[in-house]
């Protein structure tokens, strides 16, 4: 089971990724984890990555693809893998195709922008414990206060509406074209292209999970 998980920030990919990885016994691979691991190992590629990151530069697609090929050759990828947040752009997807990285499925978790804004901008956190509330879906007993300690809840900078909308616009600009890319490839070349599935990311976690299973297992 070799798959890519696509979806906007706040679409609930993390919850589904965890379920898929447990179900099929595959690792979840993100570029951030790969880059950190390469730096830690101090391999030739890792030293290159460290140098680029220390100078504040962007790691090139060539290096990322080389890291991907190294990573998926590891023993824990024997049953497959799940790419989360990679590829991010069409050039990265093209580079994966050219590098002959085989994929079985591309799964898009689709959620309307306004629903995502409501989900994320409504989150409130208790800094001391990490307890998470939501002003609509899971409100504290007393507005703005943690149920256990009575201390003030905060809204993380990442969850502010302007920040959420900015992240969504970056997603639509850079990553959403991948949805079209994989959908068209699956239509044009069903023999070699990964199967493309779109799952509605609204409703209960269980209902979404069922859609995911139906898509991946048929």
Swiss-Prot record:
InterPro entries: Adenyl_kin_sub, Adenylat/UMP-CMP_kin, Adenylat_kinase_CS, Adenylate_kinase_lid-dom, P-loop_NTPase. Keywords: ATP-binding, Cytoplasm, Kinase, Nucleotide biosynthesis, Nucleotide-binding, Transferase. GO terms for molecular function: adenylate kinase activity; ATP binding. Its EC number is 2.7.4.3. Pathway: Purine metabolism; AMP biosynthesis via salvage pathway; AMP from ADP: step 1/1. It catalyses: AMP + ATP = 2 ADP. PROSITE patterns: ADENYLATE_KINASE. The keyword Cytoplasm applies. Its main location: cytoplasm. Residues 122-159 are annotated as: LID. It holds the Pfam family ADK. ATP binds at residues 10-15, 123, 132-133, 203. The keyword Transmembrane helix does not apply. GO terms for cellular component: cytoplasm. It is found in: Cytoplasm. AMP binds at residues 31, 36, 57-59, 85-88, 92, 156, 167. Consists of three domains, a large central CORE domain and two small peripheral domains, NMPbind and LID, which undergo movements during catalysis. The LID domain closes over the site of phosphoryl transfer upon ATP binding. Assembling and dissambling the active center during each catalytic cycle provides an effective means to prevent ATP hydrolysis. Monomer. Belongs to the adenylate kinase family. Catalyzes the reversible transfer of the terminal phosphate group between ATP and AMP. Plays an important role in cellular energy homeostasis and in adenine nucleotide metabolism. This is Adenylate kinase. The lineage of its organism: Bacteria, Pseudomonadati, Pseudomonadota, Gammaproteobacteria, Oceanospirillales. The gene is adk.
């Amino acid at each position: 089971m070799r798959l890519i998980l696509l979806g906007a920030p706040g679409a609930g990919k993390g919850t589904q990724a965890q379920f898929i990885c447990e179900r099929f016994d595959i690792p979840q691979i993100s570029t951030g984890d790969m880059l950190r691991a390469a730096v830690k190992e101090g391999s030739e590629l890792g030293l290159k990555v460290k140098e680029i990151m220390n100078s504040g530069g962007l790691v090139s697609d060539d290096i990322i693809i080389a890291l991907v090929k190294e990573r998926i050759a590891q023993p824990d990828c024997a049953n497959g893998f799940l790419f989360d947040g990679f590829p991010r752009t069409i050039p990265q997807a093209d580079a994966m195709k050219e590098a002959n990285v085989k994929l079985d499925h591309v799964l898009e978790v689709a959620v309307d922008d306004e629903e995502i804004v409501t989900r994320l901008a409504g989150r409130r956190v208790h800094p001391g414990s990490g307890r998470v509330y939501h002003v609509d879906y899971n409100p504290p007993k007393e507005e703005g206060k943690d149920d256990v300690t009575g201390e003030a809840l905060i809204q993380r900078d990442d969850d502010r509406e302007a920040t959420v909308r900015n992240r969504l616009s970056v997603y639509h600009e850079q990553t959403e074209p991948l949805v079209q890319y994989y959908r068209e490839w699956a239509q044009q070349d069903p023999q070699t292209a990964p199967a493309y599935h779109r799952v509605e990311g609204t409703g209960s976690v269980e209902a979404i999970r069922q859609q995911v299973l139906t898509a991946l297992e048929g």
